[in-house]
Design a protein with these regions (language model features):
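Fe-S-dependent hydro-lyases/dehydratases of central metabolism
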Residues: 1-237
C-alpha cells in the first residue's frame, strides 16, 4: 500500500557535491564569545516544523540576527541559477562583477566549477544542546561553511561535516562584514589532499588573503564533505 505523508512532512532538498572552487558570501557576523545551538536555531515555537526542513530554516538565527535568512536566501538564489546551468551574471549583476574580478586573477574559474553559497562568521559557535538542526538549517538555506576561531563542541562541528559544510577555523583576526565575498580556489583538492592551510581571498576587500584550516578530519569525513552531505555519501558509496 502507498505510504501516506502528511502535508507537514517535507523532503530534504537536493544537495550538490562540493565544487572545485567556492564563492561564499558572509550572511552573518557574530562577535559574541560563544554562540549556542539555541541561538542558531531556537527551540519551542519551531518544534511544529521539525519534519519540514525549509520551514524550520526560516527561524535560523532569528533571535540573534533576524536579517540572516534573507541574506542567505539571496545568495542561494544565485546558486540555483548556477545549478540550472544558466548565467549567474545575467540574473545577478553584483555577482557578475565579483566573478569578473576573480577571473582576472584565476582565469579557469567559471560557473560550472565554482559553487556559490553563504557562510557565517562566529567566534565560537555550537555550544549547548546537540541539536542537528543548528547545522542543517544553514545547509538548506545554501550554507556551505562556517568560519570560526574555534568550535564550542565536537558535536556541532560533526553536524556541520555531516551536512557537507566546511568547518573552517581562522587563527588570525579578520574584520569580516556582512556581504563580504570570500573566494576559496581549489577547495575540493584541498579537502581531498588534506591541505593544512587553505588560502582564501576576500574579493571586495582588495582580495585580502586569509588563511583557513579544516583541522582534523577522517577520510570518511572528507568524503562526506566532497559528496555534499552524509545523505549523498550513502547514496554514492
Amino acid at each position: 500500500s502507498e505510504m501516506c505523508i502528511r502535508d507537514s512532512i517535507k523532503d530534504w532538498p537536493e544537495m550538490v557535491p562540493l565544487t572545485d572552487n567556492l564563492l561564499l558570501k558572509v550572511a552573518s557576523v557574530i562577535h559574541d564569545p560563544v554562540t549556542t545551538t539555541d541561538e542558531l536555531i531556537p527551540s519551542g515555537e519551531t518544534s511544529s516544523y521539525r519534519s519540514n526542513p525549509l520551514g524550520l530554516a526560516e527561524f535560523t538565527l532569528s533571535r540573534k540576527d533576524p536579517e540572516y535568512v534573507g541574506r542567505a536566501k539571496a545568495i542561494q538564489a544565485v546558486e540555483k541559477v548556477r545549478e540550472a546551468g544558466e548565467c549567474m551574471g545575467k540574473a545577478f549583476p553584483e555577482v557578475k562583477e565579483v566573478m569578473h574580478a576573480i577571473k582576472e586573477k584565476f582565469e579557469d574559474v567559471c560557473g560550472s566549477n565554482t559553487g556559490v553559497g553563504s557562510t557565517i562568521y562566529a567566534v565560537k559557535p555550537g555550544d549547548g544542546s546537540a541539536r542537528e538542526q543548528a547545522a542543517s538549517c544553514q545547509k538548506v538555506l545554501g550554507g556551505w561553511a562556517n568560519i570560526a576561531k574555534e568550535y564550542a563542541t565536537k558535536r556541532y562541528r560533526s553536524n556541520l561535516i555531516n551536512w557537507g559544510m566546511l568547518p573552517f577555523v581562522i587563527d588570525k583576526d579578520f574584520d569580516f562584514d556582512n556581504d563580504d565575498y570570500v573566494f576559496i580556489p581549489g577547495i575540493k583538492d584541498a579537502v581531498k589532499n588534506k591541505t593544512e592551510v587553505i588560502k582564501a581571498y576576500v574579493v571586495n576587500k582588495d582580495f585580502a588573503e586569509i588563511e583557513l584550516r579544516l583541522g582534523e578530519l577522517t577520510d570518511d569525513e572528507r568524503q562526506i564533505i566532497t559528496d555534499g552531505c552524509l545523505i549523498n555519501y550513502y547514496k554514492y558509496n
